[in-house]
UniProtKB/Swiss-Prot annotation:
It holds the Pfam family TPR_8. Keywords: Acetylation, Cytoplasm, Disease variant, Endoplasmic reticulum, Isopeptide bond, Phosphoprotein, Repeat, Ribonucleoprotein, Signal recognition particle, TPR repeat, Ubl conjugation. TPR repeats lie at residues 11-44, 109-142, 226-259, 406-439, 447-480. GO terms for molecular function: 7S RNA binding; RNA binding; signal recognition particle binding; TPR domain binding. This is Signal recognition particle subunit SRP72. It is found in: Cytoplasm; Endoplasmic reticulum. SUPFAM superfamilies: TPR-like. Changing D44E: Reduced interaction with SRP68. Changing V45I: Reduced interaction with SRP68. Changing M580A: Does not affect RNA binding.
């Protein structure tokens, strides 16, 4: 290599500087020195390679890729496939990185490592799993722990996004990363309690490892723990403990972690908790899901879920056009997905356009028959909300894969019974029983449907139709006395002889008798307490003997208290129980008497005489026809007067209000 260079420094000396800076990790100075070498020889392959490495170490991936693409001819023999693919990977050009790796002349270990990362980002988990398995088996270096962590991450992704039951790879949970990935796999399988325990272990390991790492900054443990706490909050949310989950989510957001993917997921989960409540908070949180680079941090299903929730939030905030725009975009990306069309239908229903919503759902059902069941269930729900039960039943019966299910049969029979369409309800039973007869004969669901059909027919008086069902049940279990009794009851109306013949199969009274130890019953003390039931005494009941009746009354009767001014020598007033104005010696008020009697009749007339002259006080003749709700009665004669205790005297025409005033002035009758 020719000597010379900038400022009289020789090229070997420059290379020595590059080597020294590289060992110290000072790639900025190393890059400057490499550029000096390239000024001397611009086509130096080693210098170009070093420049690319320095740029990558400094995070200048775009510049590094430009250097590689600019000097393609020079670097043809010394291929930089790994460096090029790595730059494309870090620039989120994943498809280009895959092509670069696949076109490489030689598949080195570091290219395989990168290949696994690229496959993971492309969500090709089966291929990715095979690559990492091969690397774990055949690699022997200090990065074995990282490879196992990546392998467990692939298993967790399969469990969550593809619902694949993870196989036991025998990975020991020695680090918090491995524990975290194991917990994620358990969440995908629905084992939430076990996942929470593993996450708590991951938290302990994380705190321990970070406390031992003296080089780590104070933000590092918070960032690592935030991911674990976020997953804990997600488990709490799945368990229905939304208040605890919400509190933990908000604590993480207050820490302001730099991971935009974590913030986006937490914000999305808070929005799902808020639903149609606290929409102002949801509007603030949705901004976190729009941060730059989020699309490169999350999986496709996570991004899709965030978009769905954005559409729902737009619907809850009455942004109809925004809701339609987002849901239409989602439908164009995934035409077969149910949620976009369901969101559009929900928006139409909020606008009271139920007919359009049903038409939209019907169109989707025709285009995607594989997803028609869920759509038709929604259509039936809308029909029921409109009060069109019969149409809803027709829609439900058109779902071939569900119409024989016990739950569907129950719903249809209930709705047909509500519509008093018993024949259609029986037809639903018949079709379901026939399906089980052909596919799952004598299964528990089959026999249960037969019994329910028989009970339903008996309930609505279809005993003749219930006979075949009861016979089938009795043949399955001849010892079922209840079914036999129902069968005999049904035959008694149709074929009495057959009912009589079947009654012979009933057990005898001797076999039905209970095996009871009579002596033990006789020797027992009997009931220690019997609750008395009170009842009304009717006129037909036999009277008790006078002595017994008086004796019981004397026992229950308490001695009354006499008033303080009681005088035993004075005879009590026999009319003391009557109100003052109803007593025979009552003469009315003295003050203002003439004033009150103005217009009441001729002067000198008594109250009794005035009542006889008053036509309104005379007994009216019976009506020619009874009033609605009452019987026609003949008026009683004046000699048969009801006692004053139950009827006011004829000479008391005053109003109720005046009576109350007089009672207050006259006082109650006393001794």
């Amino acid at each position: 290599m020719a000597s010379g260079g900038s400022g009289g420094v020789s090229v070997p000396a420059l290379w020595s500087e590059v080597n020294r800076y590289g060992q110290n990790g000072d790639f900025t100075r190393a890059l400057k020195t490499v550029n000096k070498i390239l000024q001397i020889n611009k086509d130096d392959v080693t210098a170009l390679h070093c420049k690319v490495v320095c740029l990558i170490q400094n995070g200048s991936f775009k510049e590094a890729l430009n250097v590689i693409n600019t000097h393609t001819k020079v670097l043809a023999n010394n291929s930089l496939s790994f460096e090029k693919a790595y730059c494309e990977y870090r620039l989120n050009r994943i498809e280009n990185a895959l092509k670069t790796i696949e076109s490489a002349n030689q598949q080195t270990d570091k290219l395989k490592e990168l290949y696994g990362q690229v496959l993971y980002r492309l969500e090709r988990y089966d291929e990715c799993l095979a690559v990492y398995r091969d690397l774990v088996r055949n690699s022997q270096d200090d990065y074995d722990e990282e490879r196992k962590t990546n392998l467990s991450a692939v298993v967790a992704a399969q469990s969550n996004w593809e619902k694949v039951v993870p196989e036991n790879l025998g990975l020991q949970e020695g680090t918090h990363e491995l524990c975290y990935n194991t917990a994620c796999a358990l969440i995908g399988q629905g084992q939430l309690n076990q996942a929470m325990k593993i996450l708590q272990k991951a938290e302990d390991l994380c705190r321990r490892s970070l406390s031992e790492d003296t080089d780590g900054t104070e933000e590092d443990p918070q960032a690592e723990l935030a991911i674990i706490h976020g997953q804990m909050a997600y488990i709490l949310q799945l368990q229905g403990r939304t208040e605890e989950a919400l509190q933990l989510y908000n604590q993480i957001i207050k820490l302001k972690p730099t991971d935009v993917g974590l913030l986006a997921v937490i914000a999305n989960n808070i929005i799902t908790i808020n639903k149609d409540q606290n929409v102002f908070d949801s509007k603030k949180k949705v901004k976190l899901t729009n941060a730059e680079g989020v699309e490169f941090k999350l999986s496709k299903k996570q991004l899709q879920a965030i978009e769905f929730n954005k559409a729902l939030l737009a619907m809850y905030t009455n942004q109809a056009e925004q809701c339609r725009k987002i849901s239409a975009s989602l439908q164009s990306q995934s035409p077969e997905h149910l949620l976009p069309v369901l969101i559009q239908a929900a928006q139409l229903c909020r606008e009271k356009q139920h007919t359009k919503a049903i038409e939209l759902l019907q169109e989707f059902s025709d285009q995607h028959p594989e997803n028609a069941a869920e759509i038709k269930l929604t259509m039936a729900q809308l029909k029921i909300s409109q009060g069109n039960i019969s149409k809803a039943c027709l829609i439900l019966r058109s779902i071939e894969e569900l119409k024989h299910k016990p739950g569907m049969v129950s719903a249809l029979v209930t709705m047909y019974s509500h519509e008093e369409d018993i024949d259609s309800a029986i037809e639903v039973f018949t079709q379901a029983i026939q399906w089980y007869q052909n596919h799952q004969p004598k299964s528990p669901a089959h026999l249960s449907l037969i019994r329910e059909a028989a009970n339903f027919k008996l309930k609505y008086g279809r005993k003749k139709e219930a006979i075949s069902d009861l016979q089938q049940l009795w043949k399955q279990n001849p010892k079922d006395i209840h079914t036999l009794a129902q069968l005999i009851s049904a035959y008694s109306l149709v074929d009495p002889e057959k009912a009589k013949a079947l009654s012979k199969h009933l057990p005898s009274s001797d076999s039905m008798s209970l095996k009871v130890d009579v002596e033990a019953l006789e020797n027992s003390a009997g009931a220690t307490y019997i609750r008395k039931k009170g009842g009304k005494v009717t006129g037909d009941s036999q009277p008790k003997e006078q002595g017994q009746g008086d004796l019981k009354k004397k026992k229950k009767k308490k001695k009354g208290k006499l008033p303080k001014n009681y005088d035993p020598k004075v005879t009590p007033d026999p009319e003391r129980w009557l109100p003052m104005r109803e007593r025979s010696y009552y003469r009315g008020r003295k003050k203002g008497k003439k004033k009150d009697q103005i217009g009441k009749g001729t002067q000198g007339a008594t109250a009794g005489a005035s009542s006889e002259l008053d036509a309104s006080k005379t007994v009216s003749s019976p009506p020619t026809s009874p009033r609605p709700g009452s019987a026609a009665t003949v008026s009683a004669s004046t000699s048969n007067i009801i006692p004053p205790r139950h009827q006011k005297p004829a000479g008391a025409p005053a109003t109720k209000k005046k009576q109350q005033q007089k009672k207050k002035k006259g006082g109650k009758g006393g001794w």
